[in-house]
């Protein structure tokens, strides 16, 4: 195990802070582990996807597009940074750190930056930005973001620098994506340029992490601490899913724009429930199965890409078509 003293000097105070939380957690408040583990779920990708999708399908198309752009770009950036930095988890940096046993199975791969912190600050922060005139909701969302970040520290699966960087990525994206979307809205063709730019970035990023990036290969008792090949695989298939989401959003905005408010309330509720069930009990487990079983790329990438496209392009086209048919028959 790599000792804390062998790490850069700025890591030591962070380890000390985690040890302080650990002493509190193990000594008196270990029962809070389950609470913080439930809180941290809000930073996982599938739940923000559900929030974005319900907004996109049923409430406000433009707001949903903004949130999906935040979630997608956040995922592309954080996964790329994780592969570049190759920072180990706290319990690898110091054998004094003992993370919550409940959280370890969900904290695989590299540590920096915190994906949960970045995702929550992007999507929940973006939601707060959209609802900035409703102070109570904004304050509640900001508190939830901070609580998610703190939960990663409490559980011992991230250092403060991981969390702070993740929160910063989300904060920067909130304003950057708003500027980009406002620019694209001035001419619909610009959404095609956005799609092209995202695809180019993702392609170059994947080429770099697959062919040129250098990875640490460290063993403890003959066991590889972090398997770079597995991390590369996960990043690649996640990129496929995210590209499906983003390309679907941009193509839908260009060629199939719709206003959920033009659909009657009952239909919107049915659309949200049906789509939500597909995400929660379908796509979520398909994606998990692909990653856990390391399905070969020739099968995994098309499935992941189609899954993303289904949420942001195919499903809206389907329910928009049937809405027109029902309205026509009603006349």
Protein language model features and the residues they cover:
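Membrane-embedded catalytic cores of phosphoryl/pyrophosphoryl-handling enzymes
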Residues: 51-52, 56-58, 75, 91-285
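Alpha-helical transmembrane segments in multi-pass membrane proteins
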Residues: 66, 70, 74, 78, ...
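Short glycine-rich, polar/acidic loop-and-turn segments at beta strand-coil junctions
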Residues: 55-57, 71, 85
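Membrane-interface helix-loop-helix junctions at transmembrane boundaries of multi-pass membrane enzymes
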Residues: 62-64
């Amino acid at each position: 195990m790599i000792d804390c003293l062998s790490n850069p000097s700025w890591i030591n105070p962070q380890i000390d802070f985690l040890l302080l939380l650990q002493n509190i957690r193990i000594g008196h408040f270990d029962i809070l582990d389950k609470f913080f583990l439930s809180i941290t779920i809000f930073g996982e990708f599938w739940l923000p996807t559900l929030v974005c999708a319900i907004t996109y399908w049923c409430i406000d198309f433009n707001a949903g597009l903004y949130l999906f752009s935040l979630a997608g770009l956040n995922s592309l950036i954080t996964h790329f940074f994780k592969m570049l930095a190759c920072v180990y988890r706290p319990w690898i940096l110091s054998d004094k750190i003992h993370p919550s046993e409940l959280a370890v199975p969900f904290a695989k791969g590299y540590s920096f930056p915190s994906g949960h912190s970045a995702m929550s600050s992007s999507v929940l922060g973006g939601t707060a930005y959209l609802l900035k005139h409703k102070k109570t909701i904004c304050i509640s969302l900001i508190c939830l973001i901070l609580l998610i970040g703190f939960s990663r520290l409490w559980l011992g699966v991230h250092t403060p620098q991981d969390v702070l960087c993740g929160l910063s990525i989300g904060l920067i994206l909130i304003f950057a994506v708003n500027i980009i979307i406002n620019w694209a809205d001035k001419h619909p063709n610009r959404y095609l340029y956005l799609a092209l730019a995202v695809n180019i970035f993702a392609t170059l990023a994947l080429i770099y992490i697959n062919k040129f990036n250098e990875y640490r290969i460290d063993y403890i008792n003959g066991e590889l601490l972090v398997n770079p090949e597995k991390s590369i695989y996960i990043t690649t298939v996640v990129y496929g899913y995210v590209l499906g989401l983003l390309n679907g959003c941009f193509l839908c905005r260009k060629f199939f724009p719709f206003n959920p408010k033009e659909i009657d309330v009952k239909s919107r509720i049915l659309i949200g429930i049906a789509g939500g069930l597909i995400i929660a009990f379908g796509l979520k487990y398909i994606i998990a199965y692909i990653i856990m079983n390391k399905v070969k790329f020739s099968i995994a990438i098309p499935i992941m890409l189609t899954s993303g496209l289904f949420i942001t392009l195919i499903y809206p086209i389907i329910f928009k078509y049937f809405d027109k048919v029902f309205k026509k028959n009603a006349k």
